[in-house]
Amino acid sequence: MFYFFLSSLLNYNFLLIAAAVIPAIFLMVKVYQSDRLEPESTAVLWTLVRSGIFSCLIALVSEKVFSSVLTLIVPQNHPLYLVLLFFVVVAFSEEGAKYFMLRRSSWNSPEFNCQYDGVVYAVFVSLGFALWENISYVLHYGFSTALVRSVTAIPGHTCFGVFMGVFYGLARRVENAGDSEKALLFRVLAVVVPALLHGAYDYIATTNTNTWYFVLFIAVLFGASYWLVVKTSREDRYI
């Protein structure tokens, strides 16, 4: 009887984890398949996913620290509280952690020799982050959460990764061309732009009672990200 119960529990948890992981893997494959010039090695991709998982742990600590500081400065019932929480604490903790691990694991890689590589690298880090976060959510809240996050949060992290990767690839290109000032600007944008999008995503999802505003936002976000992937892939070149 105990064995049957344990076996059922393990099978259920396996299904939950599969439901959490499969959407992220699917999106990784789609972005990877768009790498026309020189697809990255499995070793590089696995390093990026692990970096994304580690960035999730960094962000968790950062969010706890800075959200505690925020509550000391701004009352939780103040209208400004949620703005600062989502746009500053959560968004910059998560996107900043992703960027930190992205740069640490790929900036000096000899395989970083095409502009579209920046998109692949950033998306794999973002989805490593999302994969770990999703497993945690799904194990706590079940299949319904897996279904909702598979069409919202997982693609959302992918989109943030696309925007980060576009600027990251541009930064590498102009750095190789000797323009370090413009490279710095693109590196800053690689954090700021996805952080602002992330903050808007969380803020609209949490505070807006009209679901259609959120649906419209993610439709535009997904559409813009898809267009960027297609454009960057089509115009890819060695750098």
Spans of model-derived segments:
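Hydrophobic alpha-helical segments at protein termini of multi-pass membrane proteins
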Residues: 1-239
